[in-house]
Amino acid sequence: MMGIKTILRDKLRNAQRVAVLGIGSQLRADDAAGLLIAKELKTYLKDNKKRNQLKVFLGETAPENLTGQIKKFKPTHLIVIDAVDFHLKTGALRVVDIRTEAGVSFSTHRVPIGILRDYLYKSIYCETILIGMQPGSTEFCGCLSQGVRESTQAASKEIREVLKNFI
C-alpha cells in the first residue's frame, strides 16, 4: 500500500491552489486528529509567502460553516483531514477515494462522506481528497490515544513535505 505522501503527490500533481480543511472535536479524544494536523500545518505555514496558493482552514465539528471562506479562496484541490472509522488499527491512515466510499461515516458527526463531498463540490467545485485516520476512542473528554498521537505527527510531517511546493 502506498503512503499518503506518494498518493498526495500524485493527486496534487496539477494543483494550482490547495486548501486544507481539518475536521474534529478536541473534546472527543481521537476525533481531534484532523484538527490537530491542520493546526500543526497552519503553524508551520504561518510565514507562507504564497498564501494565495495554499491555505489551512480549521473546520472543527462544523466544516460546512467554512465553505464560504473556502469558496472565496478558490482552491483547485481541497484536502480534508478527519477521524474516520474504517474498523482498522488505531492511528491507521488512509487516503480515501470519496467517489467510491460514499457510505463511510465521519466518527463524531456521522455525516456520510458522499454527502460532504457533494456539498463541497457543488459549492466549491474542486477536487477533494480525504485523509482519514482511524480513531481508537471518541469518548467525550477522553485523552488522545498513543497510536493517534504518533500518526498525527507522522501525517503532519508527510503532508508538509508534499505541500513544500506551495510555500
Segments (PLM) and residue ranges:
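N-terminal catalytic or cofactor-binding beta/alpha core of small enzyme domains
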Residues: 1-135, 142-166
